[in-house]
């Protein structure tokens, strides 16, 4: 990895998305996806084409190793995902090693912090701040405004041009900071409880999205990503879902709890999870079957849940 420079970088790992796909006799994987920002038809494609952005984690540096530092870190975790997947989907496996337990939690937490939506939310906040800054500066006849400790000149520039320049300059620091925050959270949550849910009913399935980690917090409606009380949920494939709970949920270290749902319980569980995926997604819903996405869209339209 260190000798080859990656340009198209997946912010949701292809190896993860493959578990929601179907392989043909040539071992080529395909998934169905729906772009909720366009609201058009459901299409099929390779997971390699989804959830990818050019130079997303590219760092500053003179060597490939320096520029690839963050991308290589994520790729190293991704190479272990098949092992993680086998652990989570083995119904007979309850007790695991400390190393495997921590690897599962590391994957979920880093996935929470590496998606494009998190960066888009930051850019939207910047855009609002720049619009206000430019407006105030114009009132005083100035050609610049201050954002934090930085002076932002805007003469003959649109807000979008300023935002693009700022993002290009600051992106490496922000990417590194997000990884740093993720690792700090992991160190505080690496002994947390793991619960796996399995759907044993062919009528119901989980799907995923371009922002697949969902957050639940029963103690407050105003929480941060780094809140230790957050429950972190991730759909693993069409039949499996993992939730990471605070440590106290399971008193025995490195034990996993497993729950099996069918019938009405499976229906309720998958509807709830899939609606959360629709709400959290920046653009794409992703599934192994077209009808799974169609059912979510139908439920949302029928119950007027788009907003």
Write out the residue ranges for each language-model feature.
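Alpha-helical structural context detector biased toward long hydrophobic helices
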Residues: 1-8, 14-307
């Amino acid at each position: 990895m260190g000798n080859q420079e990656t340009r198209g970088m997946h912010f949701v790992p292809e190896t993860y998305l493959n578990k929601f796909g179907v392989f043909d006799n040539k071992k080529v994987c395909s998934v169905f996806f729906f772009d909720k920002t366009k609201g058009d038809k459901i299409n099929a494609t390779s997971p390699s084409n989804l959830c990818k952005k050019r130079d997303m984690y590219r760092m500053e540096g003179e060597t490939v190793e320096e520029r690839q530092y963050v991308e290589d870190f994520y790729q190293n975790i991704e190479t272990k995902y098949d092992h993680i997947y086998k652990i989570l989907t083995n119904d007979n496996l309850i007790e695991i090693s400390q190393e495997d337990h921590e690897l599962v939690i590391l994957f979920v937490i880093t996935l929470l912090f590496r998606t494009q939506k998190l960066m888009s939310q930051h850019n939207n906040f910047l855009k609002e701040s720049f619009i206000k800054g430019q407006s105030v500066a114009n009132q005083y006849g100035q050609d610049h405004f201050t954002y934090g400790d930085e002076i932002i000149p805007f003469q003959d520039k649109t807000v979008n041009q300023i935002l693009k320049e700022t993002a290009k300059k600051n992106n490496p620091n922000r990417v590194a900071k997000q990884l740093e925050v993720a690792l700090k959270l992991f160190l505080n949550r690496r002994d947390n409880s793991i619960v796996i849910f399995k759907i044993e009913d062919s009528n119901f399935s989980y799907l995923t999205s371009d922002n697949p980690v969902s957050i639940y917090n029963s103690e407050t409606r105003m929480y941060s990503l780094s809140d230790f009380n957050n429950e972190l949920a991730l759909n693993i494939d069409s039949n499996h879902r993992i939730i990471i709970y605070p440590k106290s949920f399971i008193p025995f270290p490195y034990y996993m709890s497993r729950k099996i749902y069918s019938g009405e319980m499976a229906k309720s569980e998958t509807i709830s999870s899939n609606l959360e995926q629709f709400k959290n997604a920046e653009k794409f819903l992703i599934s192994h079957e077209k009808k799974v996405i169609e059912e979510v869209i139908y439920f949302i339209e029928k119950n007027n849940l788009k907003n």
